[in-house]
Amino acid sequence: GWNDATFSGDYRYFLNCWSDANHPYVYTIMDRKGKVVREVLNNDKLTQDLAQFEPTKKEFFTFTTSEGVSLNGWMIKPANFDPTKKYPVIMHQYSGPGSQQVTDSWSIGSMGNGGLFDYYLTQKGYIIVSVDGRGTGGRGAEFEKCTYLNIGDLESKDQVEAAIWLGKQDY
């Protein structure tokens, strides 16, 4: 999951926003020891409303490139996924320095981030995939800074490697 905290001026309380890739935001007020004081918003109604569309779960994966680099990704498969059938794949990635697309957090809006349009495409039989290549954030300074003064080279290679890896899957 993903947490984002906003603290009170005296640090006695904080507003915590929690989500994961398959659950919308839950806002709670907590004390400094992490005890829930009050739930502000749980988004149960949104969860129920979205259930009618039968969204499939975002799945996370890791693979290793031919250069020995471990890359993280996520994919959303069609609802009636058959692992013996081949599916068209749509890959989306920004890969700008320090960016991160592969997070275990809620994303309902934009295309390519696991938003509603991506789920619509899965209903039409597509697999949607995002892979964080070298230069993206969340993996430490060495991983993020390896593209310094060489933007576009390693990031592109990593996306090609991801496509090759996906092409080798049974589906």
Label every model-predicted segment:
Residues 2-171:
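Serine-hydrolase catalytic core recognition
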